[in-house]
UniProtKB/Swiss-Prot annotation:
InterPro entries: PSI_Ycf3_assembly, TPR-like_helical_dom_sf, TPR_rpt, Ycf3/AcsC/BcsC/TPR_MFPF. This is Photosystem I assembly protein Ycf3. The keyword Repeat applies. GO terms for biological process: photosynthesis. It holds the Pfam family TPR_7. TPR repeats lie at residues 35-68, 72-105, 120-153. The keyword Repeat applies.
Amino acid sequence: MPNNQNRDNFIDKAFTVIAESIVKIMPIADKEKKAYIYYRDGLAAQNNGDYSEALEYYKESLLLEENKIDRGETLKNMAIIYMSNGEEDLSIETYQKALVENPKQPSCLKNIGLIYEKRGRYAEQNGDLDQRDMWFDKAAQVWSKAVRLYPGGYLDIENWLKTSGRSSIDIYL
């Protein structure tokens, strides 16, 4: 029986072959096909941990992509890389750009909130309660939007909002 890594590689390769076949036969403009190919290559590089290569592919995709939802997804992936690299301000800025393109991305709001919450915990550890409250309030603000977009999807965040006293809503609908 193959190990999980071999199985995952097989699935990735099969998906790539299928996706390439679909892209070839789809009745879309060459520009859109190229944008998708750059996006796909960026995703593959990101999954392999080659973040600088992934960012280059994503940037090329953005130059060609016109679909706002696809642009938002590409920007979100770039923000994830920036967040992983510790570039929190650039990550927040890129998440915000993703939300301009596609405002219905609760994961962008969730991740912005994670950065704010982390900053609040750091301020708390340093005894700066005013800064802690400011960052926690900012986290609550974006997390409230996230759970409204994806009710029941972020139960840990809903619980944090309730237990921290930063939300009086019992159910986000």
